[in-house]
């Protein structure tokens, strides 16, 4: 039986890509294309089992509350999740057993692997900084991917008992050292011609390591989204990060 899929934000750039990707499979059935002017009841009426959400930070929580309370699992690429929002999603899931929610800062497999590799490398280097580069229409900075990457690096450093990074800066223009994410500097670039890119730079005595990832178009997100749709039934509750669905 094909998995019945609905797409929220279906007329957006990423949404259109996901619609095309689902239609190009044999094991998934697109049953609902919902945009901001449409009623969410279309998801229930169509029998959607899994919803893909690429909407806006202002809309996503209402979308998730509706889906979870109606027994529909959700694969979410929308940004804007902080700890309070994640806690709310966990609460909704706890009241609706069997529903799965996958929230991923990035669905590009190369970006997911960058985050995993960065965490693995973190304990071997004194210093680490993250640079993310995106198109100028992106609403948030730094990106969720960069934040997630920095948090993983910081956690790995804590687990290894490492001290704070060396940095003798005493005078700096506001923002020149980037945002501080758990002690890891994160720098955001917004530039025409870019889509989604990230570089993680590590340094220690006499050597550096750069892990770099590039998404050149939005088709890069589709394979990861399809992984989420196909596997979410085996992951009830909230999962943050596509890496938990991959055999790494």
From Swiss-Prot:
One of its GO terms (molecular function) is NADP binding. Keywords: Amino-acid biosynthesis, Cytoplasm, Diaminopimelate biosynthesis, Lysine biosynthesis, NAD, NADP, Oxidoreductase. GO terms for biological process: diaminopimelate biosynthetic process; lysine biosynthetic process via diaminopimelate. Pathway: Amino-acid biosynthesis; L-lysine biosynthesis via DAP pathway; (S)-tetrahydrodipicolinate from L-aspartate: step 4/4. CDD domains: DHDPR_N. The active site is at 134 (proton donor/acceptor), 138 (proton donor). (S)-2,3,4,5-tetrahydrodipicolinate binds at residues 135, 144-145. One of its GO terms (cellular component) is cytosol. It catalyses: (S)-2,3,4,5-tetrahydrodipicolinate + NAD(+) + H2O = (2S,4S)-4-hydroxy-2,3,4,5-tetrahydrodipicolinate + NADH + H(+); (S)-2,3,4,5-tetrahydrodipicolinate + NADP(+) + H2O = (2S,4S)-4-hydroxy-2,3,4,5-tetrahydrodipicolinate + NADPH + H(+). Pfam families: DapB_C, DapB_N. It is found in: Cytoplasm. Its EC number is 1.17.1.8. The keyword NADP applies. Catalyzes the conversion of 4-hydroxy-tetrahydrodipicolinate (HTPA) to tetrahydrodipicolinate. PANTHER family: 4-HYDROXY-TETRAHYDRODIPICOLINATE REDUCTASE 1, CHLOROPLASTIC-RELATED, DIHYDRODIPICOLINATE REDUCTASE. This is 4-hydroxy-tetrahydrodipicolinate reductase. It comes from Corynebacterium efficiens (strain DSM 44549 / YS-314 / AJ 12310 / JCM 11189 / NBRC 100395). The lineage of its organism: Bacteria, Bacillati, Actinomycetota, Actinomycetes, Mycobacteriales. The gene is dapB.
